[in-house]
Amino acid sequence: MKASELRNKTVEELNNELIELRRAQFSLRMQLATQQLNKVDQVGKVRRDIARVRSVLAEKAKAANASQA
């Protein structure tokens, strides 16, 4: 998932994406703990996707505050 794709989404869509990614992260952590996870790199990819979504949300919040001031 690219940051440019995320910037085109609304805040509501980004929040939904964040919830979905958090659920995926939890699932991957449980699979890792029970040694059922084959692709260990997925944990890092999901973590970076969460960071991207949170960064775009912060950008949008900052832009909204700047336009109101």
Swiss-Prot record:
Q: Which UniProt keywords apply?
A: Ribonucleoprotein, Ribosomal protein
**The organism's lineage?**
Bacteria, Pseudomonadati, Pseudomonadota, Betaproteobacteria, Nitrosomonadales
Q: Which InterPro entries does the UniProt entry name for this protein?
A: Ribosomal_protein_uL29, Ribosomal_uL29, Ribosomal_uL29_sf
This chain's source organism reads Methylobacillus flagellatus (strain ATCC 51484 / DSM 6875 / VKM B-1610 / KT)
Q: Which GO terms describe its molecular function?
A: structural constituent of ribosome
Q: Which HAMAP family match?
A: Ribosomal_uL29
GO cellular component terms, A-Z: cytosolic large ribosomal subunit
Q: List, alphabetically, the Gene3D superfamilies matched.
A: 1.10.287.310
Kindly give the Pfam families that the UniProt entry links to this protein: Ribosomal_L29
Family, according to the entry, reads as follows: Belongs to the universal ribosomal protein uL29 family.
Q: What is this protein called?
A: Large ribosomal subunit protein uL29
One biological process term from GO is: translation
- Kindly give the CDD domains that the UniProt entry links to this protein: Ribosomal_L29_HIP (cd00427)
